[in-house]
């Protein structure tokens, strides 16, 4: 198949994502054992998959529901990383429809959990594809109740502005201004989950939470947020990101 020229905006997004990966892994305390198999859920343009393969992973599969992103990831792999073609593969598919007989040592997910509408169902699908003792590395944010938790998709001008308006008002104005037809905030790719709800989902998932950190960053603003988040009535509104590691229990645990 003839390779297409890479879209410049997508390539720029990929390159930015690659630069951010050092911070991503640092927030977990470093990369996991790389002589292993990995599944990247919500792989986007494939930066994390390429990083894992370059670092020594035995096998890396990236899945994403956006066909254009997967198209870019495949072309980028063929053009710029041909030496990794036997290690990395990309699939434009919902995880629920990906081969559930294959299990991985690790599942990774970067900046995706806040966009997954039915997160409990997604975690259940992850469990099926995780080896006993395997780990899920997930880092994501901003959370919906954060100052820009709407990912600037609601056209709110001020911080926390999306929380001061009803969903109905937001939807009505977006439909009128952008000539679209959405019926809920979910249509913007935002699950609206709170910090408490994320914790409950992880607790009920059947996976063991072995690492959990809120506002995991050295940025001065997030350090300040951490101080404010210590006050129970402010916690939800200053919960910017979550970095967690979830473990699938072994039979003899």
Model-derived features: positions:
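Conserved phosphate-coordination/catalytic loops
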Residues: 15-19, 117, 192
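Conserved N-terminal segment of class I S-adenosyl-L-methionine
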Residues: 1-102, 106, 110, 219-220, ...
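Helix-to-beta-strand junctions that scaffold the AdoMet/dcAdoMet cofactor pocket
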Residues: 116-117, 130-131
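S-adenosyl-L-methionine-dependent methyltransferase catalytic module, highlighting the catalytic core
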Residues: 120-125, 135-244
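A structural alpha-helix within SAM-dependent methyltransferase catalytic domains
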Residues: 50-53, 123-127
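Short glycine-/acidic-enriched loop or helix-start segments at secondary-structure transitions
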Residues: 50, 72, 118-119, 147-149
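A generic structural signal for alpha->beta connector loops
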Residues: 57, 85-87, 133, 206-209
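Short catalytic micro-motifs in class I SAM-dependent methyltransferases
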Residues: 111-115
